[in-house]
Regions:
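N-terminal basic/disordered segments at the start of proteins
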Residues: 2-15
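Alpha/beta enzyme core
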Residues: 12, 17-23, 33-56, 61, ...
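Short, glycine/acidic-enriched loop or turn micro-motifs at the edges of active sites
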Residues: 25, 84, 206
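Active-site flanking residues adjacent to catalytic metal/cofactor-binding acidic residues
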Residues: 80
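Conserved small/polar residues in nucleotide/adenosyl-binding loops
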Residues: 200-206
Length: 210
């Protein structure tokens, strides 16, 4: 039997995450979120298959507006996957979403992140921190607002899992440091409704080590 570390429970809508709760099934839509009818149809199909939480991509303002209507037509908690702009998160919160997924690689302005956190805290909406290798900040530039590192500043040349010499800064270190930077912004505002911290890399060994 696996021994699990005790965690603080977080509620996404009415679904309990952590704190000894059962594992829940979450999925993500592959429709264009702006197409409310198609997105709701797919969510209903996932509900029938046993899905308990659903995440939708929010790449622009039209998608953010659609989330409010989608929320009205489904029966499971709705998570907004925010792309690039903090105002999309604010609009989704106003529309009643149950959780946000923020990527610290593409939402890097500290004041903007703080504004999102304040709004989420007012509504008791949890946040998932999702670190993606494809949009990590530049090496030495965590918290800065310029540049995407897959094309600059040595991120691609960082040693991967199992390749780093002792004491050498690796892609694992960079992914963890990126998450810790955003966690610090949440914690400085006494925001403790962190649903999960997730990491995505191209290789399984690096994902496992992170």
């Amino acid at each position: 039997m696996t021994n699990r570390r005790a965690t603080k429970p977080v509620f996404v809508g009415g679904v309990k995450i952590g704190g000894g709760a059962d594992v829940t099934v979450q999925s993500m839509t592959k429709t264009d979120t702006r197409d409310v009818k198609a997105t709701v149809k797919q969510i209903h199909e996932l509900e029938e298959a046993g899905c308990e939480l659903i995440r939708c991509a929010v790449p622009d303002s039209d998608a953010a507006e659609a989330m409010a209507e989608i929320k009205k037509q489904i029966h499971i908690p709705l998570i907004a996957d925010i792309h690039f702009h903090y105002q999309l998160a604010l609009k989704c919160l106003e529309g009643g979403v149950d959780c946000l997924r923020l990527n610290p690689g593409n939402l890097r302005n500290e004041d903007q992140v703080r504004e999102v956190v304040r709004s989420a805290k007012e509504r008791d909406v949890p946040i998932r921190i999702g670190v993606n290798f494809g949009s990590l900040p530049p090496v030495g530039g965590i918290g800065r607002t310029r540049g995407f590192s897959r094309h600059m500043d040595l991120v691609n040349s960082l040693p991967k899992a199992g390749e780093a010499r002792e004491g050498e800064y690796s892609v694992v270190d960079h992914m963890v440091a990126t998450a810790l930077w955003e966690i610090s912004l949440l914690e400085e505002q006494n925001f403790d409704q962190i649903k999960t911290v997730s990491y995505t890399h191209l290789t399984l060994p690096t994902n496992r080590e992170v």
